[in-house]
């Protein structure tokens, strides 16, 4: 597999310089073709993946809804910078086939009924709050939950529910953006709905958005 990192990717609008690649983010079963600056067709293998780091300040560009629809937004946790004196464990090469077997999108084999019930309750909440998911995003979330729930271990909540919580946090909540008291009221109602579904990680994100928005002239947004 090949992993390409776009560091500080939103210093310029990503749709300007990455538009040819964004077209390939649509789900497909075969390798795609892009035409770059040399005008020659370039075949893109299935094994190529992009990761991007972004910053949020006055020097960066916002991410478009079109881009967010095709990406999973992962917020890195704050960690203590403690020097690790133990030697790093050497990990050998991992084949694409093995990666797909463990981490590729999967249908939910267990708790399918519970996940379906969660979906039926969540979708009206999202739509009522103005978050409209494309069929692509719904497929990606379902595939993620199927893969993650087979890897996660049950803890304070079932593995499938924790996986669904991560999916909502990464695919739905980045779309939150709005201003004013009326939007805040809807956001509080949305938070209560997430809490009733047991999506505690997503609730924490909404709480953070509410706190920051209250201190930023009622401007509530994920980024």
Predicted features along the sequence, with ranges:
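C-terminal regulatory/interaction module of P-loop NTP-utilizing enzymes
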Residues: 1-223
